[in-house]
Design a protein with these regions (language model features):
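Extracellular/periplasmic juxtamembrane helices and adjacent flexible linkers that interface
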Residues: 28-31, 256-303
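N-terminal segment of the mature folded domain
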Residues: 30-157, 202-203
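Ligand-binding cleft/hinge of the Venus flytrap
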Residues: 52-58, 141-202
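Short secondary-structure boundary segments
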Residues: 90-91, 164, 221-224
Length: 303
């Protein structure tokens, strides 16, 4: 009898522990699905993803894991299947990604690339404006020409800091140089760097702004990131008008990713009415204007 009682007590204890564990499992439910997204640094540095992430996670019971990269690096992660979706802003690189058969069609949009927000690029620089690009109604191309001319003339007060990282912003910068009549590789990246006025940072947008500020240099930035960092910078906006400065954000589901359905949920989420309204007001209380604008078919195009 003495030997039986301890065995019974042990069995009761084991059954109690099992019931507790099973009960906890039932309460907690299954672990959330993991969705990996590579995003541009501008969307991350502005804090937009910090706002969107918890809403998306709660709505879809998902663990959203975000990696902030330049567009070029983000798309490379999409090619290898290291992420399930990318949120980027370089139409030319996006088109190449889709042409390479790395993108999956978004179910509700019947296309691989879905635009969901936009803002504008601006040229910023020191208030002293040694290249003289402000207040003259210059186009972005004309402003770049003046910066190049002054830099090439060894005006030591004129410098330009580039992202230099194959990001969407870097792509836009190269497009402006090309539109201004320059061979980017030879005239800017080569001769400009040799002359010392053109500097490639190789960093994200926030870090590039800080570097340009420290060097009292010009740079190209999306307006949202500039507004988010403006309080800690001496740089000022100098040129902010021109069709070439349009900056459209798109989301693409990666064909080599492993969570298509949840990635498609992200696409639908970003275009949902309540999220579009959130984007329209994001940053207004702090900066007096939005850091991004919601999707507009007349500006961003379809879908």
């Amino acid at each position: 009898m003495k030997g039986i009682l301890p065995k019974i007590a042990s069995m009761v204890l084991i059954l109690t522990l099992l019931a507790t564990v099973l009960g906890c499992t039932e309460i907690l439910g299954p672990s959330p699905e993991v969705l990996r997204v590579a995003t541009t640094t501008s969307l991350y540095d502005t804090g937009l993803w910090d706002t969107l992430e918890p809403i998306f996670e709660e709505r879809y019971h998902v663990d959203l894991q975000i990696t902030a990269q330049g567009t070029g690096a983000a798309l490379k992660l999409g090619m290898t299947g290291d992420v399930d979706a990318v949120a980027v802003h370089d139409p030319a690189q996006e088109a190449a990604f889709i042409a390479g058969d790395y993108a999956a069609e978004a179910a509700n949009f019947s296309t691989e690339r879905v635009t969901w927000a936009y803002n504008y690029f601006i040229i910023v620089g020191p208030e002293a404006d040694p290249a003289g690009i402000s207040g003259r109604n210059l186009t972005p191309e004309e402003a770049f020409q003046k910066i190049q001319i002054e830099g090439a003339a060894h005006n030591e007060t004129v410098k330009f800091v580039s992202r230099g990282d194959e990001s969407g912003t870097h792509g836009k910068e190269k497009a402006i140089w090309a539109s201004a009549g320059y061979n980017y590789t030879a005239d800017i990246q080569g001769t400009g760097a040799e002359a010392g006025w053109y500097i490639e940072a190789g960093t994200g947008m926030g870090a590039t702004l800080v570097m340009a500020d420290e060097m009292m240099a010009y740079t190209l930035t999306d307006k949202g990131t500039f507004l988010a960092y403006q309080g800690n910078l001496d740089l000022v906006p100098l040129v902010d008008a021109g069709d070439i400065l349009l900056n459209v954000y798109a989301v693409i589901i990666c064909k080599n990713g492993s969570h298509y359905e949840m990635a498609n949920n992200l696409v639908n989420f970003l275009r949902a009415d309540d999220i579009q309204a959130l984007i329209a007001g994001f940053g207004v209380p702090e900066y007096g204007e939005p850091l991004f604008y919601p999707w507009d078919p007349d500006i961003c195009g379809l879908p």
